[in-house]
From Swiss-Prot:
Residue numbers spanned by region Interaction with substrate tRNA: 30-33
Obligatory cofactor(s): Mg(2+)
Identification of the protein by name: tRNA dimethylallyltransferase
Record gene name: miaA
Keyword Transmembrane: no
Chain residues that bind substrate: T7, A8, S9, G10, K11, S12
Source species of the chain: Rhodopseudomonas palustris (strain TIE-1)
This protein's UniProt keywords: ATP-binding, Magnesium, Nucleotide-binding, Transferase, tRNA processing
Taxonomic lineage: Bacteria, Pseudomonadati, Pseudomonadota, Alphaproteobacteria, Hyphomicrobiales
Xref: SUPFAM superfamilies: P-loop containing nucleoside triphosphate hydrolases
Catalyzed reactions: adenosine(37) in tRNA + dimethylallyl diphosphate = N(6)-dimethylallyladenosine(37) in tRNA + diphosphate
One of the GO biological process terms: tRNA modification
Family designation: Belongs to the IPP transferase family.
The protein's Enzyme Commission number: 2.5.1.75
Length: 301
């Protein structure tokens, strides 16, 4: 069972309800909720919620790790095997489309980039700026350079790392994929699609609740580690803005506004991404989800 959807759409509550009713195990498919340092700011299930049904792959990775889609698929393969041996229903839930695509379509065969290449590219990114790297990428991989926004630091650096390390453009590697761990015909895949305005209001209220629940202290502890700002955990929604506040650059109110706005923009992109990249997911209104699950999984939802 795959449950996807934009952030704050009610995925976790639905997955927990299904796990309790079916004897299932909830398996995380969110790229930020894997980090143990970020329970509050990523809206990970609470300890009380985790006690109601088995949960896997939540808070298992240190924030200093650049946890890739390949690493996720490897971890998910182990979790799925263990859940199946236990005779439980695997319920994969999250909002990271790339993870779902890797699970159901297979993973591209991009080899690991040597640390010295990655470090050299990041050093030049900080020293020379993203425009210089974008121009260099155009010389090595013009297709990627044309496709990527000139200010997209992360993706430009990644594309340049791959072509420098392997001598082949990233698109070439993406054409080679491994067999999918979860073929589309073997799963029920749902995308929760709430009303946009209601979702955005919920995002705003949830971000405020996160701050009241200790998100600022959580981010302060992360900031004290002085990790590479390009690491995924350091770019989780709300983290950069709250770090700016902790440095005295902006007020807490400004940080909250930026964090909530970034999250709303991300939710909008999730709608678009799933519609175009994973059209096999069944779009369901949250209020209709129970009825849909009872139809496709009678007696288990």
């Amino acid at each position: 069972m795959l449950i996807a959807g934009p952030t704050a759409s009610g995925k976790s509550a639905l997955a927990l309800k299904l796990a309790q009713a079916s004897g299932g195990t909830v398996i995380n498919t969110d790229s930020m909720q894997v980090y143990r340092d970020l329970r509050i700011i990523t809206a990970r299930p609470t300890p009380d919620e985790e006690a109601l049904a088995p949960h896997r792959l939540y808070g298992t990775v240190d924030a200093a790790v650049n946890f890739s889609a390949g690493a996720y698929v490897e971890a998910a393969a182990v979790a799925l095997a263990e859940v199946r041996v236990a005779g439980r229903l695997p319920i994969l839930i999250g909002g990271t489309g790339l993870y779902f695509k890797a699970l159901t379509r297979g993973l591209s065969a991009v080899p690991p980039v040597p640390a010295e290449v990655r470090d050299a590219v990041r050093l030049r990114l900080d020293r020379d700026g993203v425009q210089a790297l974008h121009a260099e990428l155009a010389g090595h991989d013009p297709e990627a350079a044309a496709r990527l926004a000139p200010a997209d630091r992360t993706r430009i650096a990644r594309a340049l790392e791959v072509v420098l390390a392997t001598g082949r453009p990233l698109a070439d590697w993406h054409q080679q994929t491994s067999p999918p761990l979860l073929p589309p015909d073997d799963v029920v895949a749902v995308f929760l699609a709430p009303d946009r305005e209601a979702l955005y209001a919920r995002i705003d209220s949830r971000f405020a609740a996160m701050l009241q629940g200790g998100a600022l202290n959580e981010v302060a502890a992360l900031a004290e580690r002085q990790l590479d700002p390009l690491l995924p955990a350091m770019k989780a929604h709300g983290v950069p803005a709250l770090i700016r506040h902790l440095r005295g650059e902006i007020t807490l109110e400004e940080a909250a506004s930026i964090g909530a706005a970034d999250t709303r923009h991300y939710a909008k992109r999730q709608f678009t991404w799933f519609r175009h990249q994973l059209p096999e997911f069944k779009w369901v209104r949250p209020q209709e989800a129970d009825a849909f699950l009872n139809t496709v999984m009678p007696g288990r939802a």
